[in-house]
Amino acid sequence: MPERRSIYDRTTRGIRIYLATPRLRGLLAVNVAVSAAASMVFVNTVVIIQGGMGLTQSAVALALALASFGAGSMIAALALPSLLNKLTDRSVMLSGVGLLVVGMFAGTLMVGQHSLMALWFVLGLGYSAAQTPSGRLLWRSSHQEDRPALFAAQFALSHISWLLFYPLAGWLGARYSMTIAFAVLGCAAALAVWVALRVWSSIDSKEIEHEHSNLPEGHPHHATGSLTPNGIRHSHPFVVDDYHPRWPSSGR
């Protein structure tokens, strides 16, 4: 029977699991890159349409721009089940944020409604490719009883970056120009991608060999591992929990 925990304890536990898991630290960096790029779409589309780049002031132009972003997102989402059968979550998500970075720097050269629609379509592709597999990572990185806390941590931590980039996108566009906003947020997204590549190893094995030195007598791990001078050594799908508080260095 899982131990009952307070809301505060569950939230804290989720954040501790999240930050102790390398692939989830990579996911956090991906979330930062996504929010940096997508803030331009969600905050500045109306401003761009109404004069930031001299486009026609029209509800139709706005609808077409947002529809382009939505179409890119939908196409990526529909393609992902097939892609994820052939590629790793890491490859797909980092390709998605890479596409966002390229799109942000391309935005510094954007002129006219057709280029805006094409760019928003590309950003939609990258946004969906980077975001959609995140639930798989959270599921893979937790026991059933810890998943509510871990999903809560994902919600809280990812929204910190939205809290930063929403006002920053608006301020940069209003204070300087859309070109500057694209460039600055593109640099922020690129930095986040670099961090993701550093903290999320391409070698992300499901099962990791590791050693326990302080298991209680009668713990099931005694039956599945081999004795060593320091304790029990064995291999199984690794998630951070009470008996596995730190990620093994061999699993990176």
State where each predicted segment sits.
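Transmembrane alpha-helix termini and helix-breaking/packing motifs in multi-pass membrane transporters
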Residues: 47, 51-53, 164-183
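Helix-loop junctions at membrane interfaces in 12-TM secondary transporters
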Residues: 108-120
